[in-house]
Amino acid sequence: MTTLKNRFSIKWPVFLWVLIISGMLSACATPTPTITPTSSPTMILETETEEATQTPTALITPTATQADLGNLGNPITLGFILTPDETGAIEAAEEIAVLIGEDTGYAVESSIYPDFQSLAIAAQNGAVQLFWLKPLEYIYLNWEGAAQVVLVTNHLGVYAYGVQFIANIDRGFRSYFDPETNQSTGEVNQALQQFSGTRPCFINSSSIPGYFVPLGLLENASTPTLDPVFTQSYNATIRALFIQGICDFGVTYALNGDPLNDIDIVQNLPEAQDQIEVIWQSEGIIPNINLSASPNLPANIEFNIQEAVLDLPLNPVGLSLLSTALKEEIEAVKTVEDTFYNQLRIAILPLDLDLEAITHNSSTP
């Protein structure tokens, strides 16, 4: 007993010192930091930016298909040259389009242009399918590949009119014209070469029957003349020839009337009917107003429109509407080919005319 007690007494102080020293060491040691998970803001921002800048997929919109020509969404256009103040003619043009539409079943609209230049641009761009043209306007657009004649109108009993050369009988020219048959006799060159070196009375520098055609016929007959006198009217030409000393011969329109029978001449200068004679008269070489079509117009549509216009005279108001819209008395219409214009082309060929300038700047028929 004494031995065990003594052993315990010896070890106990040593144990206490070990505990004290261990406690002191633990208190002096640096505490281990707590590990906290770190967020990744950079990754979140990149993700948000990527989502924000992502380009949305474009929606595919189906392309609208244009309706067939002649349907409501794509009507056939019928061009008229009319000024805005010509309201009666514009209304008549609209009525004509309605009648053609009813006859054919197509959607047809009138298209009004203030001048030929505007219509020519539309025709060349394919913006108008059918249009009414004067003769030089047609020859120009046909040359440009933008017009093909469909129909021609009858005015004052003819589809094409002519020109006549007249003179005072005291001037001594030989007449190559038979008033009984209303036709010329002999060769045109013989008739016209009498005028070589003489002075003509023309109407104005933009008139087809009063300047271009007779001048071209004289050129074709190799007949040079002196500088012309421009009288501005057919009656003035007749008066100048009757008085004499102003010009040696004159020109007027023919076949669709005779200026010598004008009421003014008959009443105020009746002697002119005996004193002024026709030296030579052409055939009908100047066509009246025509209906032309764009060469791009489908043949079946052109034919159906052609037949509908030919039917207009059968309508009680058809010819009246045409006359109002075209601003001249229309008695009938008929189909013609482009060759119908060849005589006019031949007549003006030697003049080398600038048809674009003439048709764009002139309103004289």
At which residue positions do the language-model features occur?
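Periplasmic-binding protein-like
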Residues: 77, 81, 155-164, 228, ...
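A ligand-binding cleft/hinge motif common to bilobed small-molecule-binding domains
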Residues: 132-145, 215-220, 243, 248-273
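A conserved helix-loop-strand patch within extracytoplasmic ligand-binding domains
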Residues: 153-211, 216-221
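Short helix-initiation/N-cap motifs at beta->coil->alpha
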Residues: 110-121, 136, 225-243
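Ser/Thr-rich, Proline-interspersed low-complexity disordered segments
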Residues: 28-72, 361-365
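Extracytoplasmic small-molecule ligand-binding "clamshell" domains
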Residues: 66-139
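Ligand-binding cleft/hinge of the Venus flytrap
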Residues: 94-106, 188-189, 196-198, 204, ...
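An extracytoplasmic/periplasmic, membrane-proximal ligand-sensing/linker region
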Residues: 70-76, 84-95, 297-365
